Amino acid sequence: MANRAPRGDEADYVVVGSGSSGAAIAGRLAESGASVIVLEAGKSDEKLLVKKPGLVGPMHAVPQLKKPFDWGYYSVPQKHVLDRRMPVPRGKVVGGSSSINGMVYVRGNRANFDSWAAEGNKGWDADSVNAAYKRMEDFEDGESEFRGAGGPIRVTRNKLPQEGTLQFIQATADAIGCEILDDYNAESQEGVSRMQQNAADGLRYSASRGYIHHLAPATLQVQSGVLAKKVLIENGRAVGVEVVDATGSRRTLRAGKEVILSAGFVGSAQLLMLSGIGHAEHLKEHGIDVLADLPVGDNLHDHMFHALTFHVSSSKNKGTPPYFARGLVKELMRPGTSFLAHSVFEAVAFLKTSQAAEVPDLQLHLLPWAYVTPNQDAPIRHDVDKRPALTVLTTLIYPKSRGTLRLASADPTAAPLIDFQYLSDPADLEVLGEGSEMVREIFASGAFNGSIKEELHPGKGLRGQELRDAILNRATSVYHGVGTCRMGVDELAVVGPDLKVRGIEGLRVCDASIMPSITGGNTNAPAIMIGELGARLVLSEPDGGAETCQGN
């Protein structure tokens, strides 16, 4: 097949969103020879704050630094957590959220995907998903039964773990009785390990770096600074996308084959509803003609964490900034040699809060400094103690609570109403409470050699209901929203296992919004995998990669 670049504003495929899934599916489709236009509302990812892994800390701690790369969403007041409005960072930049996240690389538990398949989602079982992961990975240990090599996304371990990090790993094994894992992304996830990251050689390996910049297929065109207003649907078929660019000019991009939405759990659901696909009554409330009555925006869920911070005596464990400035100078002079060449997270554990659990229901992220999450009185302020410290983000990875995403208006520039309904199911609070007590057991271990001085937050005297109250005051999101365009074979599904939107031809959704249920761990790697597997689904169509773009 002859490769041919997009002609003007027309291509075989128009992909909305250049994030984790969008970059992956667009890169693979273009690699096959198909012409692809990717629409991105944000600007270039070739910025120091984006490229240097360790700068993700100050980026998220200082709102002014993050603002150029973030949609800046907030949830509606969350009535089960003291009516707090939670920040919902979403990448508004080439690479999407993969350009501003913590670069933690977690595939998820194999049982997650077998569960999807058991619900009727053929082709999404653990073995099928493993094949997609292997295609996308370039793991530092090389290829094996469960890991890939030579793919677009480089995956490495943190090479500069601090003393407290190594003590934490041993303490977790001692206190919980779990295994110290060499690779939690292989056959078994349960245990404690050094963190894996999609970063290498001092650079963030976002989806855009791997699939757009490095693959660089000639038939791929990225249009940045372009906001998608709605999908253009004619006679029940998606034929293009109406957009407005940075100058305010409005135009339509035509798709000869398919329109693919990869705008994430917020953007894809919002765009479907603006295009007439969603709950009929809700669309009518906003004066939108109904083209397909589907449960768009339902099934919203997310990972939530509660941070515990401990003051340590070790002089080898860093405090918080100003050491960022020193590290930045070293990193600029000798790339890849300072802690700024790595993710801010250094260790991870996947544990069971109950032996009755079939898979680990708790994830611990270790930060080598003090970090206290925002409280209800200061929703965007990060309180940071300057003393050497270790912080554990005690994370609920299988929430039972479910929320919704709805339109605030028919204006595509208006932020939607994001209601996670955090902790609406009491079982979620109990897991966070049990997990917090487990973290205390870990930090009481002799493996720390007496270096733990005190519990800075929430405070060792807090137990029972007082601890639960502290969790309600401080628990917040890990920014892993999923599920608003649920994949399935029943009436609660928005897309089928082929990612095609029910009732509309030529339209797919390919991102974390399609997850029937959230994966066990950080969701960036699964989102990239969804793009990788989604490309195979598109190309498996009889004329999936054939050129249909018209033009002279």
What role is predicted for each listed range?
Residues 1-552:
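N-terminal redox-cofactor-binding region of secreted/periplasmic oxidoreductases
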